[in-house]
Amino acid sequence: MSWLDWIDHGIESQFNPRVAVGDAAESWLNGWVQESLRRKAELGGVFDIAYGTHELMQFDYASGDLALPVIIYINGGYWRALDKSAMMHHMADLAGSGFGVVNVNYPLCPEVTLTEIIACLNDAIAAIVVHVDAKT
């Protein structure tokens, strides 16, 4: 069956986890936010580094062991939900293992298009390279 044959709900459930799993998603995501707030203090990083003019064009950086690679974590909120603040617990786990970690925010749909998100992430990567190079 082609995706073009799906009814609107079927298409929406493929692209929106909140539709696919219902109320369980909110509880799960709220848990992420609470755990992220609790673990942010462990990071000792630099937060909300701007890489553009939009309020969501920011990243966080925890340097870890500068001899190890830097991992860039991009929020996977289906381009339209959440932000980096809900992902701090992932960042803390990686930084706790010695990696440098960058946690990136970007503007969300429908305010911007996917093409604009890609442009923002290109800008973010360029700014991250400059920032990390300055720290090493």
Cite the ranges covered by each PLM segment.
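N-terminal membrane-anchoring alpha-helices
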Residues: 1-13, 17
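N-terminal cap/lid segment of alpha/beta-hydrolase-fold proteins
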Residues: 15-66
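Short beta-strand element of the alpha/beta-hydrolase
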Residues: 68-77
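Short beta-to-alpha linker loops that shape the active-site pocket of alpha/beta-hydrolase fold enzymes
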Residues: 77, 100, 105-109
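Short N-terminal helix/helix-N-cap motif within the alpha/beta-hydrolase-1
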Residues: 81-85, 111-112
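Short amphipathic alpha-helix adjacent to the substrate-entry channel of hydrolases
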Residues: 85-103
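Alpha/beta-hydrolase active-site loop
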Residues: 112-134
